[in-house]
Each structure stands twice: as structure tokens, then as C-alpha cells.
Amino acid sequence: MARNKIALIGSGMIGGTLAHVAAREELGDVILFDIAEGLPQGKGLDIAESTPVYGASVNLKGVNDYAGIAGADVCIVTAGVPRKPGMSRDDLLGINLKVMKAVGEGIKAHAPNAFVICITNPLDAMVWALQKFSGLPTEKVVGMAGVLDSSRFAYFLSEKTGVSVADIHAWTLGGHGDDMVPMVRHSTVGGLPLTQLVAQGWMSQAELDAIVERTRKGGGEIVNLLKTGSAYYAPAESAIAMAKSYLADQKRVLPVASYCSGQYGLKDMYVGVPTLIGAGGAEKIVEFDFNADEKAMFDKSVASVNGLIEACKGIDPSLA
């Protein structure tokens, strides 16, 4: 049986962390790609030299040519410029759209059968553009955002309640930005909806509201603390969870940026929704029932994503 091949397009902080985790978990052979000569080779060699310590039998290679990703089963895209303090994800649009064009063309030419996970911000617009540039089937191109945002939500809930993260199921939908929608009614701690936790005195409504707001600002909190970059450990782990569900046909339902073709009343756009990920890629979108407040928040988030998509079309007319 042939080994899986994982191509990591972008060898910065997230790319390097992805390579380390993928190697340690033996998901397959790892190719690190970057346009910066020496960077993917150096990180690949460093991680390869660590594998005898933990006994992982994987091959790692760094490349500067898209030909090196040929035949990849999974491509995880982190290429682009990260956020700096004071920047929103949307500020990256013009720069990273050009990067997505080059990446999409590279994947189309050398790894057209891959399952593609995009991490580059602004996420929802970038994954939409990447699918257009690559021409891959929409079910084979997804964005990593909701897994990360939901993980942050779950961690903050665990921190407040003292309950293990293993018994917390948090959902965050919508665009990956300040208008994201942490789903209070659909998230649970020990099986109890968060609304019931408030009623039982685990936390006040004000404390829950603060956790929801901290979740929305979670990425910015880390950017401000680091001062020279953005989060990379949690984003990498989130993408690995998505890749594993695809490679092992786990059929996990994860909140990811998926292509909507009528679901949630949306067409021809990517946004964060619960998605069943298996060997076919994004196999099915799960549709939550929204109350009036949730729908209003989701619609606002969708409007923000639509604005970014329209901006992409303005920058690159080939996307119109």
C-alpha cells in the first residue's frame, strides 16, 4: 500500500508545526514547499533528524518548485503574509490573493487529486479564490477556521467551568473574523447546553457573553501577545484533525469553511458550517436550525464574507 503524501505549501510557523505533527503522527511522507530557498529544506531536515528519537518512519523533504508536490494526497496551504498587531485578517486580502493564484495554479498542475485545506487569511475569501484558481472540485477544497475557533471557545469554557475539554463540544460558525458566530445553544458542557449552565449557576450570562467575545477576538489576542506573528500551534492541530478525517475516512463532523450550494440559503461561497469530512472530502453539510438572533448573526457574518469575495473579484477580474 502506497504511503500517503502530505504537501505543506508554506513553510513558516504553521507549516513547520504541521510538518512536525504530521511526522510525529506518521500521517504520511511530508513535503514542505516554500519560495524561500533553504527554508523548507532546513525545517524538513531538522524535523527528519528528530524522527529517530520518537521512532517515526516518515520521509521529509523541502522543495522550492511546485513539481515537488506531485501526487500529494493532501495539500495544506499556509502560504501568505500573517497578521501583525493592529491588522485585521481583511487587511491581508490584496497580498494573499496573488499568493492564492500561484498556489492554485501549482496544485492544479501537480496535485489535482488532492484534498486541499486552506489556512491563509482572510480565510473564507482565500479558500473561495483558491478553489477558483485551482479548478478542483468544491468538495475537495475546504478552509480551516471553525475547528480552531471552536477549540478556542471550548478551551475558554473549560477554563471557566473546570470541566475537561474532552467533555466540551463547542461550535463556531460563519466567517473567520470578528463576526464569527459562537453557537451558544448548540454548544455543550457535559451534555448540557450553555444556556442551562447559566441557569444552573455554573457561570453568569455576563461571563458567558465575555467568553463568546473572547472567542471572536481569540486570534487577535495572540497576535497582540506575540507582537511579531500570529498563532500557529492551534491552527496546525486543527488542520491535522481535518486531514486525518479525510485520510482515514473518519466521517467526523467538523466546523470548516465549506462550499455552499444552497445550504443555509447560500450559493457559490465558502463559509464556516458543520461538515462531514471523509474519503470523498467535504461529503455533507449539516444544517443547524437557527433562532432569530442566531440567523441575524450568521447573516451578518455571511455579509462580511461576501464583501471580501466581491473585493477579490475587483482585484482579479478572472474571478468575476
From Swiss-Prot:
Pfam family, one: Ldh_1_N
Active-site residues, as the UniProt record annotates them: H176 (proton acceptor)
Source organism superkingdom: Bacteria
Keywords, sorted A to Z: NAD, Oxidoreductase, Tricarboxylic acid cycle
Residues that coordinate or bind substrate: R83, R89, N121, R152
InterPro entries in alphabetical order: L-lactate/malate_DH (IPR001557), Lactate/malate_DH_C (IPR022383), Lactate/malate_DH_N (IPR001236), Lactate_DH/Glyco_Ohase_4_C (IPR015955), Malate_DH_type3 (IPR011275), NAD(P)-bd_dom_sf (IPR036291)
EC number: 1.1.1.37
Residues the record lists as binding NAD(+): G10, S11, G12, M13, I14, G15, D34, N96, I119, T120, N121
Catalysis: reaction(s): (S)-malate + NAD(+) = oxaloacetate + NADH + H(+)
One Gene Ontology biological process: tricarboxylic acid cycle
GO molecular function annotations of the record: L-lactate dehydrogenase activity; L-malate dehydrogenase (NAD+) activity
Family, similarity comment: Belongs to the LDH/MDH superfamily. MDH type 3 family.
Its biological purpose: Catalyzes the reversible oxidation of malate to oxaloacetate.
Protein name (record): Malate dehydrogenase
Organism: Hyphomonas neptunium (strain ATCC 15444)
Gene name as annotated: mdh
